[in-house]
Amino acid sequence: MYVPEEIIETIKMIEYQNLDIRTTTLGVNLKDCADKDLDLLKENIYNKITSFGGNLVETANKVSQKYGIPIVNKRISVTPIGLIMGSTLKGLSNEEAIDACVEVGITLDNIAKEVGVDFIGGYSALVQKRATPEEKMLIRSIPKLMTKTDRVCASVNVATTKAGINMYAVKKMGEIVKETAEITKDAIGCAKIVVFCNAPEDNPFMAGAFHGPGEGDAVINAGVSGPGVVRAVVEQLKGKDIGTVSDEIKKTAFKITRMGELVGKEVASELGIDFGIVDLSLAPTPAIGDSIANILEAVGLERCGTHGTTAALAMLNDAVKKGGAMASSNVGGLSGAFIPVSEDAGMIEAVEVGALRLEKLEAMTCVCSVGLDMIAVPGKTPASTLSAIMADEMAIGMINKKTTAVRIIPVPGKDVGDSVEYGGLLGTAPIMPVSEFSSEEFIERGGRIPAPIQSLTN
C-alpha cells in the first residue's frame, strides 16, 4: 500500500531532482553470426540485431509514458566483435583485415541509426593475456572506425585479477588513443574508447558496454541515475553524523533501484526478452544539481578533490551498493558512483579552481565504480604517458579485484587552462595537467605484469 507522501516524493524526484532511467540496453549475442564471407557476416549481424532490437526505442518510450519515468537513452551492446572475426579475416593482408573490421563497425553504426538507439557497444577485444591475430587487427582498426562512424563504442579489456596486465596491449592502446585524437574532431573519437581491467559482461553503460560470452541470446539491462536525488537527501542532514548520512543514502538508493528494476523488467517483458540486471551506478550529467561532486560537497567538503574526498566517496559508493542490493536480486554491471569529469558540472568546477587533479582522481578510483573517465589532457601528451596512466589504473583494478577503466582524451592544440566542448551528455572537458616526466622506457618493455597473489583463490 502506497501512502500519499511516497507518491509525492517520487514525483519530486523525477520533476525536480533529475531522477531518470539513464539507459535500457539490449544485449545481443552475435556468436552465431560468424562467417568466412564478410558480406554474409554483415548480413547475419544486421538480421540478428534488428530482429531483437527493431522495437526497442518504441517499447522503451511506451514504458516511459506508462510510468511517467524518463528513459534517457536506449542502447545496444553486442558480443565482442573480436570474438567473431577469426574466420572472416583468415588469409587477408593486414590492411584488408583492418578494412574488413571497419566495415563491420560501419554495419553496427547503420543498425544503430536505423533502430534509433543512441550508441551501440561491443566493438571490443578481450586481450588480458594475449591477443589473437583478429583481435590485433580489430584494435588497429579503432582509429579508422572512429572517423567513419558516429554511434559505435569500442572497448578493450587489457587486464584482469586472474590474468594480470597485458602490457603489450596497454602500450598499443596508448598509441590507438593518441592516433584517434589526431584524426577525429576535437579528439571526440577518444570519448568512445574505453580501456578496461576486469570488464563486466553485463554493463549497460557506454562506452564500455558489450554482451559477454557468458550471456544468453538477448537480454535487457537497465542503468539508473540519481545523483540529484541523493544530493537533496544529504542536504537535509546538516549536522548529522556520517553513519546517519550513509543510512539515508542507502534508503534512497533502495527506492531508485526499485524503479530501475520495474522499468527494466517491463521493457524486457514487452519485448519478450529476458531481464538481466539493474546497474546501481549513480551516473551524473552536466546538468546543474545532477552531480556526484556536489553530493560529496553536501557531505561537508568545500570542494570535491580536497582532503577527505576519497573517504566521502567510499561512504557514498558503499551506501548505494547496500541499498541497491537490498532492492534487487539482479544487480550487476558496474554498480557504484561514476566520476566522469566532463559529464559532471561539480567535477568541472573543481578542476577549474584547482581542487581536483588527476592524481586525486586516481585515488578516488580505488573506492568508486569505474576509473579515470572523460579526462581531457594536453594534446602534446605522448602515447607512452597515456599508456602509463592506463597501466596505473589497470593495476588498481587488478590488485583490488574490481573493475577499473580509462577513457582519456588528448586534445590536439589544447593545453592546461583550455577546455573542449562536446555538448549533450559528454559535456565540457577542462584540460588537466599530466606529469612531464617520461614513462617511455617502462612502457617499451612490454610483456605481462603477472597476476597478483590474490588471484589464487581456489
UniProtKB/Swiss-Prot annotation:
**Which InterPro entries does this UniProt record tie to the protein?**
UPF0210
Q: What domain of life is recorded for the organism?
A: Archaea
* Entries under Pfam families matching the protein: DUF711
* Similarity-based family: Belongs to the UPF0210 family.
Q: Know the name of this protein?
A: UPF0210 protein MmarC7_0672
- Species name: Methanococcus maripaludis (strain C7 / ATCC BAA-1331)
The root-end lineage is: Archaea, Methanobacteriati, Methanobacteriota, Methanomada group, Methanococci
